[in-house]
């Protein structure tokens, strides 16, 4: 079986996020798994690290690639990143879910289309979604 090299990579910087949301690796881990499942991705494993005195990193390894967050609570900043291979899983859905959970004051986003030759950079359409409670 031959697989397509096509992939989509969404990167988002969020600013103005509540300190407590960004400083809780277990909360972020739970929401990252929800985000991955919301876009139809298959979660293979999850690594979460709570830093001292603050900050967290969560990496979700997907069958389709990865979803990650790196936080700087003292700055109200989080870097979100989701890359998926193939056509079936849309990384934008996972990113939209997480942005809806974090409720940032500002977001800056780019979407890369990869695996088709030269990288294509496009402006993603950000949508707020109803996060699970």
Curated annotation (Swiss-Prot):
Q: List the GO cellular component terms.
A: cytosol
After translation, the protein is modified as follows:
Is synthesized initially as an inactive proenzyme. Formation of the active enzyme involves a self-maturation process in which the active site pyruvoyl group is generated from an internal serine residue via an autocatalytic post-translational modification. Two non-identical subunits are generated from the proenzyme in this reaction, and the pyruvate is formed at the N-terminus of the alpha chain, which is derived from the carboxyl end of the proenzyme.
> Reaction(s) catalyzed by this protein?
S-adenosyl-L-methionine + H(+) = S-adenosyl 3-(methylsulfanyl)propylamine + CO2
The text of the family note is: Belongs to the prokaryotic AdoMetDC family. Type 1 subfamily.
Q: Which cofactor does it need?
A: pyruvate
Keywords on record: Autocatalytic cleavage, Decarboxylase, Lyase, Polyamine biosynthesis, Pyruvate, S-adenosyl-L-methionine, Schiff base, Spermidine biosynthesis, Zymogen
Show the InterPro entries listed in the entry: AdoMetDC_C, AdoMetDC_fam_prok, AdoMetDC_N, S-AdoMet_deCO2ase_core, S-AdoMet_deCOase_pro-enz
List modified residues, type Pyruvic acid (Ser).
65
User: How does this polypeptide assemble, per the annotation?
Assistant: Heterotetramer of two alpha and two beta chains arranged as a dimer of alpha/beta heterodimers.
Q: What does this protein do?
A: Catalyzes the decarboxylation of S-adenosylmethionine to S-adenosylmethioninamine (dcAdoMet), the propylamine donor required for the synthesis of the polyamines spermine and spermidine from the diamine putrescine.
Q: Name one GO biological process term.
A: spermidine biosynthetic process
The UniProt record lists the EC number as 4.1.1.50
What GO MF annotations does this protein's record show? Answer: adenosylmethionine decarboxylase activity
For this protein, the record's NCBIfam families field holds: SAM_DCase_Bsu
- Tree of life domain: Bacteria
Q: Where are the transmembrane segments?
A: none
User: Upper taxonomic classification of the species?
Assistant: Bacteria, Bacillati, Bacillota, Bacilli, Bacillales
PANTHER family referenced in this protein's UniProt entry, alphabetically: S-ADENOSYLMETHIONINE DECARBOXYLASE PROENZYME (PTHR33866:SF2)
Please name the SUPFAM superfamilies in this protein's record.
S-adenosylmethionine decarboxylase
Biological pathway: Amine and polyamine biosynthesis; S-adenosylmethioninamine biosynthesis; S-adenosylmethioninamine from S-adenosyl-L-methionine: step 1/1
The first-level EC class reads: lyase
State the name under which the record lists this protein.
S-adenosylmethionine decarboxylase proenzyme
Annotated active site residues, numbered on this chain, are 65 (schiff-base intermediate with substrate), 70 (proton acceptor), 85 (proton donor)
Residues under site feature: Cleavage (non-hydrolytic): 64-65
């Amino acid at each position: 079986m031959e697989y397509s090299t096509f992939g989509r990579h969404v990167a988002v910087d969020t600013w103005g996020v509540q300190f407590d949301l960004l400083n809780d690796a277990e909360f972020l881990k739970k929401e990252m798994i929800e985000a991955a499942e919301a876009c139809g991705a298959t979660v293979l494993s999850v690594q979460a690290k709570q830093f001292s005195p603050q900050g967290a990193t969560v990496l979700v390894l997907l069958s389709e690639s990865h979803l990650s967050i790196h936080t700087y609570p003292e700055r109200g900043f989080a870097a979100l990143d989701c890359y998926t291979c193939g056509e079936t899983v849309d990384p934008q859905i996972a990113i939209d879910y997480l942005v809806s959970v974090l409720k940032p004051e500002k977001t800056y986003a780019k979407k890369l289309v990869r695996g088709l030759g030269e990288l294509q950079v496009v402006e993603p359409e950000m949508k707020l979604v109803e996060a699970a409670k």
